[in-house]
Amino acid sequence: MEELERLKTRKREIEKELEDFVPKDSLIFTIPGIGKTLGCIILARVGDVRRFKKRFVAYCGLDPVVESSGKSVVSRGISKRGDAVLRRAFYLAALTAIKVNPVIKRFYEEHKGRLKGKKLITACARKLAVITWAVLYYNKPFDASE
């Protein structure tokens, strides 16, 4: 029990340090599904999002791999060439966003007939990465109607 209390105390200390690192009014926190911890991880790993014009999803390792030969085109999942920590952060955020973010929830419902399980959650993570890029790049809070 002492070990559990020590770990809880350490967790609170780390969360406090994260709050000092990232301003509370950062626009990433306007996105439903991205909380304090994951938001801080994403901001720390990405830095300035303006350096990504088109390749943010690839930097996160969530870009699709498409193989083509002749007339056939086959999708082979995600590349996994990007930042593994970011990929994991967006995956975890997507698990929550499916429940609380109306855009991700709608995306999930539209695609669950075609995709299953982890592939569908990964697709939601990619969508969440695109939303995160747009919010940070254009410096506008999340708006589900856009």
Feature-to-residue mapping (PLM):
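A detector of single, family-specific signature residues
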Residues: 1-146
